Structures are given as structure tokens and as C-alpha cells.
């Protein structure tokens, strides 16, 4: 595409612009028109987005005959002021601007306008917009901003910032409005129509005034303002001492809204509330004063209970007859509702429920039929329960414990038994030998210990039971019966007898040593208990014999 054509594309201000095809297909090779610093825009011209379209200057377009085909230039300082503080930039020109309700409708008339070369810009000097100091300044080239459309348009555009300027200033292009449910009382301050409020107020004061202006209809036909926001024009200074009184509340509410007659009086509202004594009489009873010893405890509990009620008035508990009667007003209908009794019954019911839930299984002994025992056991087949006694007996003997005592006839039959070894008829326990014969307890133990039958010479006619420790026999621990049966143990043993039993001969020793039996033991013999008598012996022989005896006894022990 050849862009070197003689046709030039310019804005209505005379400013050349790129064709749409040049922006998409390649770079622009055409020539820009010359710069004319004396050019100004007509006041009647209200531009819109249509001004961005390219226009052929050879077809009697607007400003085609202007001298020098002047371009529009923008001042950087004015541009910065315009973008940063838009309302302030137009404060100086608001009276000279001619507002247009429909800017785009004026554009169709520009083709019929005829500009003469002789007139140059004389007609433009009388334009309202030309008189402003904003567009008479030096304008930077190659800038595309539709100033006339922004200044003359009253239509709203949903672009930030969302704020308003106070009347009679022109609102910014951002006028995002919301509909409020109730008409505001202070809408005139913002320059809105009815039932419209800014979405984002410009300052904190606007936010407070907007909330303070919201009114709510009541049944009495009056408006009750939102007391949570104070108007910045009439601040209310509250004191700590008088802030809670009904009169101060009514005054503060009237100062917030500006009309005290339209507000519901706080004192009238509090006067319609029943007193504490009336409210207590209608409260359901929850305790009885009969359960307390003194009236002081009842008063203290009443004060605690009154905290749960509405705090409209202070009760007078000091009076006796005119005010609350502790035992006449509240105790009526409260009989039988003592808290202690209720707690006891509740605990008893809970305990009963727990006992029912934790009821133990009732076991019965399979053998003897008892229901109580320190420990329940089971039979060998694990099918039945046994008490502790029957379980131990069954575990030891493999049979059930007998329930009836032993018959005396069976004991009489045992009296006819005779030991097969010693022919004894009395014993503490009858046993069986390895051949199956009945033997006494002594013969049975001896045969089990030594592996052969007990000698008949060891038989004794009287049954003696073993006693552990020192017995009644004295230091030796032997009873008289044992000494009578075994006289050898009670006699002293001479040294000659000891030597002869060991195969030693000592003709020179005659009745020289006598050894007594040590208590409780048979082999524990020492020289301390030996009684030696010397007749006529050499010392060397005696020492030698003593060493031999000591060695023999040490080996035997």
C-alpha cells in the first residue's frame, strides 16, 4: 500500500493522524501538515468519539481552508493539571462554557459550516471556549485528547475516580450512582437527584453525612436517624456524668437530626417499661427462700438473680413492708422446689441409671451352688463356673469337691489296716509302696527316700510330729519322748569310742574326751563342746591326737 498519496488525514483540529490501515499494515510514509500556533477550536463545536475518524481535507472538510492548516498543540503543564485535578482546571471556565446535552449531535453540522480565508480566525476569537485560558496556551503536537467533549458533556461515564464535587461545580465524568431505599435528608449537599447517592464518597465527611442522612420510617410517622454517626457541622460533646440520663439522650438525639420533635422520647420509652418489682412477680420461680436460714442470704441471692433481669430501675431492698417481701411475694408457689432436694433427687436418679447399666452377671457355682466367692473359676472344660474352693479342689485332684463331710464308717474301716512293713496300726497317713501294699507314713517315706524298705529296728510305737525351732525339750530341742526312745543321743561319747569307730587305737587315752551332742544337728561337733580329761599324757601325743580328730571331723562334715 502506498502512503505517499497527496491525501492527508487530519483530525477536526487540523492535526494529521494515521489511517487505520496504516496502523495495521505498515509504517506511515506520508507528510504531516504544518504547525499553526494561532489555531483555536470553535466554541460551538462539541466533539465526541467520532472525531477520531480520519477526514479528507480536499473534500471541503473542516479547517481545510485554515491558514497553514494549523495543528493543535497541548501544554504539558496544563495537561498534567487536567489529569491530576480535573474539577479545579475547569473552575475558571465553567461560566464561559456552553454545555451541550448531546455533543455528538453537533458534529453533523460541521460539514455545512463555511470558513473563509479572509476571516481567518476572527470568528473563532469570539467563541466562548476560545476565551478560556486553557486552550489558548501552547499545545503540544501529536496529542489526541477530546477536551471539548469532556468539558461540555453532562453524560455519566463509569470510569474512576468515583467522586463528586459540590454544587454548583460540574461533576466529574465518573458518576456511578446507586439507588438508596429511602430518600436522603441531605441530598442537596451532594447535588444528586432524589434516591441517588454516590457509590464512593469523596471524603470521610461525606461518608458520615451520607450515613447520618439515612432516615427510617416508624409507626408514629417520625424519622429516627442513625445515632451511630454524628454530623460534622454540629458535634456533640458528652460528659461522663450526664451521658446516661434520659434527658441527655433525647438532647443528643435531637442535635444529631436537627429536629427534636420528630424523635421518640427516651423517657417515654423507659416509662412504658415495667419496674423491677413487677417483673420479678411475673418471673418463674427457680428457688425458695424457705431453704435459707437468714434473710441476708436471700437478699444476696436476689441481687445475683436480679442481674439476669433488665436493669430498668434499682430495687429498694432496705424497706420492710412497702418494697419486695422476701417470703411473701417470691415464696408463693415455690414450696417443694428446694434446690438441695432437687439436686439430691437428680443424683439419686442418675445413680440408679448407672447401677442398672453396670449390673453384674449373677454366677452360680456348678458344684456347690454358691453365688458369692472371692474369685470365680471355671471347670476343666471351660463350660461352667466354680467358686474358688471348688475350683482349687478340682484343679488339684481332678474331681469335684465333696459337698458332705466324710463318713465315720470309712474311718472305722481304716482302723483295721496294718502296715505291710512294720505291722504298725497307727499312722498319720497311710501310703502305698511300689508293689501296691499299704504301709505307714514312716515306711512309705523311708522307701521313697532310700529306695528300700525301712528297717524294723527303727519302728517306734508313738507318733511324733516334727517341731521346727526350739521346742520344750530345752537347748537341744529334743523332747523327753525322743530321748526315751533314742537314749544313745542323750549320752556322752568318749574319745576312745570315736577313735575306735574310725579305726584308731589309743591305749594311752582312757576316758580322755567326752563329746556332747550339739543342738538341732548331728554332725556339727567342735572342740569347744568337747570335755577332755587328762590323766598322764604327753603333750605331743595330745596335740597330735587333737589335730587328727579335727581333721577327721572336718572331712566328715
From Swiss-Prot:
> What does the UniProt keyword field contain?
Activator, Cytoplasm, DNA-binding, Metal-binding, Nucleus, Repeat, Transcription, Transcription regulation, Zinc, Zinc-finger
Give the superkingdom in one word: Eukaryota
Q: Residues annotated as region Disordered?
A: 234-258
Q: Does the keyword Transcription apply?
A: yes
- What SMART domains does the entry give? ZnF_GATA
- List compositional bias (Low complexity) regions by residue number: 243-258
Where is the signal peptide, in residue numbers?
none
Q: What happens when the gene is disrupted?
A: Decreases the mRNA level of genes involved in amino acid biosynthesis. Increases the mRNA level of genes involved in the response to nitrogen starvation, including genes required for the mating response. Decreases vegetative cell population growth rate in low nutrient conditions.
Alphabetically, the GO molecular function entries are: DNA-binding transcription activator activity, RNA polymerase II-specific; DNA-binding transcription factor activity, RNA polymerase II-specific; RNA polymerase II cis-regulatory region sequence-specific DNA binding; zinc ion binding
The protein's matches in InterPro entries, at most eight in alphabetical order, are given as: Transcription_factor_GATA, Znf_GATA, Znf_NHR/GATA
Instruction: Report the induction information.
Output: Translation is induced by amino acid starvation. Translational repression during nutrient-rich conditions is dependent on several uORFs (upstream open reading frames) present in the 5'-UTR of the mRNA; these promote ribosome dissociation. Translational induction occurs in conditions reducing translation machinery efficiency, leading to ribosomes scanning over the uORFs, and increased translation of the mRNA.
Q: Which Gene3D superfamilies match?
A: Erythroid Transcription Factor GATA-1, subunit A
PROSITE patterns according to UniProt? GATA_ZN_FINGER_1 (PS00344), GATA_ZN_FINGER_2 (PS50114)
List where in the cell it is found. Answer: Nucleus; Cytoplasm
What are the residue ranges of zinc fingers typed GATA-type?
365-390, 419-443
GO CC annotation, single: cytosol
Which PANTHER family does the annotation name? Answer: IRON-SENSING TRANSCRIPTIONAL REPRESSOR-RELATED, TRANSCRIPTION FACTOR GATA FAMILY MEMBER
Q: What does this protein do?
A: Activates genes required for amino acid biosynthesis and acts as a master transcriptional regulator during amino acid starvation. Binds variations of the DNA sequence 5'-GAT[AC]GC-3'.
Identification of the protein by name: Transcription factor fil1
Where does this protein come from, organism-wise? Schizosaccharomyces pombe (strain 972 / ATCC 24843) (Fission yeast)
Amino acid at each position: 500500500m502506498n502512503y505517499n498519496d497527496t491525501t492527508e488525514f487530519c483530525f477536526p483540529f487540523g492535526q494529521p493522524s494515521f489511517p487505520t490501515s496504516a496502523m495495521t499494515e505498515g509504517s506511515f510514509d506520508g507528510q504531516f501538515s504544518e504547525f499553526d500556533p494561532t489555531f483555536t477550536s470553535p466554541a460551538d463545536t462539541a466533539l465526541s468519539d467520532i472525531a477520531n475518524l480520519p477526514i479528507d481535507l480536499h473534500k471541503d472538510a473542516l479547517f481545510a481552508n485554515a491558514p497553514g492548516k494549523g495543528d493543535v498543540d497541548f501544554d504539558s503543564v496544563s495537561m498534567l493539571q487536567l489529569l491530576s485535578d480535573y474539577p479545579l482546571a475547569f473552575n475558571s471556565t465553567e461560566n464561559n462554557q456552553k454545555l451541550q446535552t448531546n455533543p455528538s449531535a453537533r458534529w453533523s453540522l460541521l460539514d455545512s459550516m463555511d470558513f473563509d480565508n479572509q476571516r481567518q480566525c476572527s470568528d473563532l476569537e469570539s467563541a466562548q471556549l476560545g476565551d478560556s485560558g486553557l486552550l489558548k496556551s501552547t499545545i503540544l503536537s501529536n496529542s489526541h485528547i477530546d477536551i471539548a467533549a469532556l468539558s461540555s458533556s453532562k453524560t455519566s461515564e463509569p470510569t474512576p475516580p468515583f467522586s463528586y464535587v459540590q454544587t454548583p461545580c460540574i461533576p466529574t465524568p465518573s458518576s456511578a450512582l446507586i439507588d438508596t431505599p429511602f430518600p436522603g435528608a441531605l441530598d442537596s449537599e451532594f447535588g444528586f437527584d432524589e434516591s441517588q447517592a454516590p457509590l464512593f464518597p469523596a471524603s470521610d465527611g461525606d461518608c458520615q453525612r451520607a450515613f447520618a442522612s439515612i432516615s427510617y420510617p416508624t409507626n408514629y410517622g417520625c424519622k429516627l436517624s442513625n445515632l451511630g454517626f454524628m454530623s460534622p457541622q454540629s458535634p456533640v460533646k458528652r460528659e461522663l456524668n450526664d451521658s446516661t440520663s434520659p434527658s441527655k439522650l433525647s438532647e443528643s438525639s435531637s442535635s444529631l437530626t436537627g429536629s427534636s420533635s420528630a424523635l421518640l422520647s427516651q423517657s417515654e420509652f423507659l416509662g412504658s417499661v415495667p419496674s423491677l418489682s413487677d417483673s420479678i412477680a411475673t418471673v418463674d420461680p427457680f428457688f425458695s427462700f424457705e431453704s435459707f436460714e437468714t434473710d441476708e442470704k436471700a437478699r444476696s441471692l436476689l441481687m445475683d438473680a436480679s442481674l439476669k433481669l433488665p436493669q430498668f430501675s434499682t430495687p429498694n431492698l432496705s424497706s420492710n413492708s412497702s418494697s419486695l417481701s422476701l417470703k411473701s411475694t417470691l415464696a408463693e408457689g415455690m414450696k417443694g422446689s428446694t434446690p438441695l432436694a432437687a439436686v439430691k433427687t437428680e443424683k439419686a436418679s442418675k445413680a440408679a441409671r448407672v447401677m442398672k447399666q453396670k449390673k453384674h452377671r449373677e454366677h452360680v457355682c456348678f458344684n456347690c451352688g454358691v453365688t458369692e466367692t472371692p474369685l470365680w473359676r471355671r471347670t476343666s472344660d471351660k463350660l461352667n463356673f466354680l467358686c474358688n474352693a471348688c475350683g482349687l479342689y478340682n484343679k488339684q485332684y481332678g474331681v469335684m469337691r465333696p459337698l458332705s463331710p466324710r463318713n465315720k464308717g470309712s474311718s472305722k474301716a481304716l482302723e483295721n489296716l496294718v502296715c505291710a512293713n512294720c505291722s504298725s496300726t497307727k499312722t498319720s497317713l497311710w501310703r502305698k509302696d511300689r508293689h501296691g501294699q499299704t504301709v505307714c507314713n514312716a515306711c512309705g517315706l523311708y522307701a521313697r527316700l532310700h529306695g528300700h524298705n525301712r528297717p524294723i529296728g527303727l519302728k517306734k510305737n508313738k507318733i511324733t510330729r516334727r517341731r521346727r525351732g526350739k521346742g520344750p525339750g530345752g537347748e537341744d530341742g529334743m523332747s523327753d519322748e525322743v530321748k526315751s526312745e533314742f537314749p544313745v543321743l542323750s549320752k556322752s561319747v568318749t574319745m576312745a569310742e570315736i577313735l575306735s569307730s574310725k579305726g584308731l587305737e589309743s591305749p594311752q587315752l582312757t576316758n580322755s574326751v567326752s563329746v556332747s551332742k550339739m543342738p538341732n544337728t548331728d554332725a556339727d561337733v567342735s572342740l569347744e563342746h568337747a570335755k577332755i580329761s587328762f590323766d598322764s599324757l604327753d603333750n605331743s601325743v595330745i596335740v597330735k591326737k587333737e589335730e587328727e580328730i579335727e581333721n577327721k571331723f572336718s572331712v566328715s562334715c
